[in-house]
């Protein structure tokens, strides 16, 4: 059994938010009620969509097999070797779940959902800075930090190991401009404090790393797991240039997302888990094989190396992940939704991108998978 190590939030080291980087955020407010992951789980249950898995399931292959064989949201409540911990998968496994995540009534026609979300994109909602939040319930310093304390799954037989990041946020800033990015870049767990981060060459994170390496410095990155679903949706999106991912998340859920400063980065105050760390300059490691959205395994021989320096988590955190590889799974549902909003870019060739978006918009999942295999280069996340 893995036990959660913790310190109380009163022991959180570091300056007040007003002192970070020598300036105060323009506005700081008290924490308000936020549509966090736990509220979303309750919505799924109230709507009769959630299946609570009460039998013991193995993190090694079992979580993934259950998720691929059942087309509904799953909350695993008994995980082998991790007493008391939980995992949510398939949270956005169909349009009804997406409706619930973004505050729509279940019966609203899908065309109206897309039209309303398209309208929402015209009104970015800037994030709200707060001084505290559930993410500060427990703070674990580097000296005792162990990412293996969480029930990180090995999702499929094709996977070479356990994947920490499959439905999460990687938050970073351009060291030259300070521009913020939140994206979903898959992460393979390498040990107690290390993981890979796979990012395509055209991604914002890759540019941030490139600029940091040009300066010869490490790039700070925060990994948020179990953030509100609107944030995960936005992190997977190709944001319009006039807004960042947190603006987009606020627009989609019609409510400002709440962020708290951790070092030089802002992280979701209501995430279940936040891992602070660094990408080391000039270091590349192999990531994979890993069963990707295309239904085939791939490998990235030039993934970044992430080293965790501090861990924050809610009490009794819920791990959030995604079992990729099956046509119509929640990653496909997300891609289809984003394509219908003209917000999908998987960094493929122009022809491949055009073809994929055509089929994603029509929810032709198997055909979109096939097109994805044609252009597969093992770097398929934003």
Predicted feature residues:
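Extended, highly charged
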Residues: 4-8, 21-305, 309-382
